[in-house]
Amino acid sequence: MPTVLALETSCDESAAAVLRLNNGCLQVIASRIASQVEKHAQWGGVVPEVASRLHVEALPHLVEEVLQEAGQSMARFDAVAATVTPGLAGALMVGSVTGRSLAALHALPFFGIHHLEGHLASVRLAEHPPRPPYLVLLVSGGHTELIRVGAESEMVRLGRSHDDAAGEAFDKVGRLLGLAYPGGPAIQALAATGDSGRFSLPKGRVSKPGGGFHPYDFSFSGLKTAMLRLVQALSEADEDLPRADLAASFEQVVADVLVERSLLCANDQGLKTVVMVGGVAANRRLRELMSKRGQEQGIEVHTAPLRYCTDNAAMIGAAALQRLVSGVNGSSLELGVAARWPLDKTEVLYHSPPPF
């Protein structure tokens, strides 16, 4: 049974996991995450230098813990995997160097994994994962994309955000409302007691150069500006800020936009399954709305398990195992890290010489 040790350090979560493929089913044998959220909360966002230092401190202990829980020595692994792109370069380097060092020391293949490919693989950790082809709504702190996953696991991006990702918009609006970082969970909690229909907010669209709009693309900068102006107007009128109603109205319009464009894209592509992955996919309103409207339109909706929506190493291991069993030999030990790299060029992460 193929078994991998996987590492994730692309942003503000240090993570390690042990995964095994047993009769075609992925098994998470052990998984550990050390979150840095509380450390970064005082600055209202991730500080790259602090993130890198905290990864250096946490990762060795996490690796030791998952190895002990799995009861597995390094000699019994088939590969080591680590996120190498995209993300904070310094943070990525911690996981990459650790992974490559372990692979070299124990003569194991190393798999440099694209972080977004990991998110796409997270749905395979569900008890009943969907079978491709399907449309993925990848919605996280740094990315909002619509990706078609084909029967042979090929990936084609059909839509994207042209400015802020949905998760970034949640964080920025959270700060505007005086909420703690990260904004997503804080807005969800506050919105639970609010009136989502009280304020009318714009659904940003992206214009085409020749006229019309990109049907599957997203823009959240206008929504963010509308929220700023609304808060300023209410404050200048000396009104008590209706934070719960503001949070609920914002959360509702984000969910509306994500659901409407995802289902439009799925229908246009003739796809009967939509998959949601990424940190924002944990949002309760989004999950409920996508499920309800998908059912109304005859589209099956799958979501990655909640514990694997936010950054974790299990999803990196899932992506690595998928590569391993498909016959990929691994990445060069000379592969570095990159803050940005397109998802449609993941194949070159396994080329020699490496792309970076």
UniProtKB/Swiss-Prot annotation:
Annotated binding of substrate, by residue: L138, V139, S140, G141, G142, D171, G184, N283
Main location: cytoplasm
UniProt keyword list: Acyltransferase, Cytoplasm, Iron, Metal-binding, Transferase, tRNA processing
One example GO MF annotation: N(6)-L-threonylcarbamoyladenine synthase activity
Cellular location(s): Cytoplasm
Pfam families membership: TsaD
Cofactor binding, per record: Binds 1 Fe(2+) ion per subunit.
Binding site for Fe cation: H115, H119, D311
Reaction catalysis annotation: L-threonylcarbamoyladenylate + adenosine(37) in tRNA = N(6)-L-threonylcarbamoyladenosine(37) in tRNA + AMP + H(+)
GO BP terms in the entry: tRNA threonylcarbamoyladenosine modification
GO annotation, cellular component aspect: cytoplasm
The EC number(s) this enzyme carries: 2.3.1.234
Top-rank EC class of the record's enzyme: transferase
PANTHER family named among the record's database cross-references: TRNA N6-ADENOSINE THREONYLCARBAMOYLTRANSFERASE (PTHR11735), TRNA N6-ADENOSINE THREONYLCARBAMOYLTRANSFERASE, MITOCHONDRIAL (PTHR11735:SF6)
Sequence similarity: Belongs to the KAE1 / TsaD family.
Protein name in UniProt: tRNA N6-adenosine threonylcarbamoyltransferase
Gene of this entry: tsaD
